[in-house]
Design a protein with these regions (language model features):
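ABC ATPase nucleotide-binding domain
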Residues: 4, 24, 60, 303-305
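The feature captures the beta-strand-to-loop junction immediately N-terminal to the Walker
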Residues: 34-36
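Helix-to-loop junction immediately C-terminal to a conserved catalytic motif
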Residues: 49
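Conserved coupling/switch loops of ABC nucleotide-binding domains, chiefly the family-specific signature
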Residues: 55-58, 208
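Conserved ABC transporter NBD signature motif
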Residues: 57-65
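Non-catalytic connector elements of ABC transporters
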Residues: 236, 247-325
Length: 325
């Protein structure tokens, strides 16, 4: 099974939300659409689901054109940020409703619901209403509903953005086990790069309705195609040195080091970054972030350096990556 988007355009009023968007998602592959609010990632998902109609372009699932196919006939499993559960129905009834609409015997429906509730560890909440559930439990009910659709494609729109950090971390393995790595293509929309890098096989970084770069998490980190991608991927974000001779130089904070033979600098601030320290230092090239081990002794007048092989170079006008020498 494959998902293909070709030259998708979508405008709302005067605003061009998607501009010639092209995307391929293979069988069992998870592609994350990553970008800032308003970049078009959720609109792309709604077009695939059939909840909106593109102005131009093609959407194909397994080679079949979907643009004019109603949403209810597209067989997509969509999980929303807001859970989209019926508040007056309990968990079992929320799951059963979709199965009733699609037909089948009561015995088959019951067996499938019991099975998915057991897998998602929700058997004890089957008769509870959404208001009686925790945020993590409500999201698992939404996942269960998507699984019961037997979809050709999974579409997940910021499914964990309403959960706290620990719950998101706990749910990731379940998401990967149940939806990602199976037979269906998965499109995962998020603004959280850590989530995208943890779950996706490839990440499409979106900007103003276009894909700025698509690649594996490692490719985007090591070979960012532009200053936009360079600063969007990686935490702390890449240092960009002021342009010199039309070239912007980028240095990852992990590649900077304290060096007694380096350039003098002044420490502006220091904070803990996991087990490491993150320093904000000022040197003759500007203000830079530097990450070093937590036990590092910081001198009163530190000096810094970095290997030239770790530099990234970008055109100062276009922001695009320059080829290596």
């Amino acid at each position: 099974m494959t998902l293909q988007l070709r030259a998708i355009n979508k405008r709302f009023g005067e605003r061009q939300v998607l501009n010639e968007l092209c995307l391929d998602v293979a069988n069992g592959e998870c592609v994350a659409l990553l970008g800032a609010s308003g970049c078009g990632k959720s609109t792309a998902l709604r077009l695939i689901a059939g909840l909106d109609h593109p102005d131009q372009g093609s959407i194909r699932i397994n080679g079949a054109e979907m643009v004019d196919v109603p949403a209810e006939r597209r067989r997509v499993g969509m999980v929303f940020q807001s859970y989209a559960l019926f508040p007056h129905l309990n968990v079992w009834e929320n799951l059963e409703l979709g199965l009733r609409i699609r037909g089948g015997s009561a015995g088959t429906r019951d067996e499938r619901i019991r099975s998915v509730l057991e897998v998602l560890q929700l058997s004890g909440q089957a008769r509870q209403r959404p208001s009686q559930l925790s945020g993590g439990q409500r999201q698992r009910v939404a996942l269960a509903r998507a699984l019961l659709r037997d979809p050709l494609v999974y579409l997940l729109d910021e499914p964990m953005s309403n959960l706290d950090a620990q719950l998101r971390e706990d749910l990731r393995p379940q998401l990967r086990r149940l939806m990602i790595g199976g037979e269906q293509p998965v499109v995962y929309v998020t603004h959280d790069q850590q989530e995208a890098m943890a779950l996706a096989d490839r990440i499409a970084v979106m900007r103003e309705g276009c894909i700025e770069q698509i690649g594996t998490p490692r490719e985007l980190y090591l070979q960012p195609a532009s200053t936009y991608v360079a600063q969007f991927i990686g935490r702390p974000q890449m240092n960009l040195l002021p342009a010199k001779d039309g070239v912007i130089t980028g240095i990852r904070p992990d590649d900077l080091r304290l060096d007694p033979d380096g350039s003098p600098c002044t420490i502006l601030s220091r904070e803990w970054f996991g087990a490491n320290q993150m320093l904000l230092v000022r040197c003759d090239r500007g203000d830079l972030r530097l990450v070093c081990p937590g036990e590092t002794e910081i001198e009163a007048e530190p000096r810094i350096s970095w290997p030239s092989a770790c530099e990234h170079h970008f055109d100062a006008v276009s922001g695009l990556r320059l080829p290596s020498d």
